Amino acid sequence: VVSNVDPKATFENLVGFNNIETGVVRRVSNLRMQGNAAKLHLALSAVPQFTGLDDAQLGQRLIISPNMKQIDQAFNSAKYGEFSGETIMDVSIPSLHDSTLAPEGSHVLSAIVQYAPYNLKQGWSQQARDSFMSLIVEQLEQYAPGIGELIVEKQLLTPVDLSEKFNLTGGHW
């Protein structure tokens, strides 16, 4: 079987559990498929200035992860259904390379925010989303002072959103 979707969707929905051996069904059923990354989109009124980066560097993929201890702490928080006080982010500003993504003078920032648990203890209510978004923007401010003032529009897709909107099992991508 060749498939472009995750193993659970492939075997459960496309092939059908009734068409495969019990051992395979058990292994597929036991796969952990809960995502732990959120997707952030920001519409910005201008290009953000990250401290210490020149224009060429700003156009590259930016990883915000000061040290291994922070990664470990963020992972542990997610493991227990919480988001970390300091997130790990993979940030890009694609409009620096493709001006059609935003109106003239404006930009878009896209980030993968690691260790955002699918099963957040308090659930992904609007209050939880707002708290997480505030935390992310506050952290971005440490690296790109003034970025909060540039935000025209923002969107946060949690693992639950990714599961529901894009049919990604467990919001895992």
What is each stretch, according to the model?
Residues 8-13, 43-45, 74, 103-135:
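Conserved FAD/dinucleotide-binding core of flavoprotein oxidoreductases
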Residues 65, 84-92, 146-173:
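A glycine-rich dinucleotide-binding beta-alpha-beta segment and adjacent secondary-structure elements
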Residues 5-10, 37, 86, 127, ...:
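Generic recognition of stable, solvent-exposed alpha-helical segments in well-folded globular domains
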Residues 1-4, 173:
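Short intrinsically disordered, low-complexity coil segments enriched in acidic
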Residues 140:
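Structured binding elements
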Residues 3-102:
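Mid-domain catalytic core of redox enzymes
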Residues 50, 123-125, 160:
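Tryptophan-centered motif/residue detector
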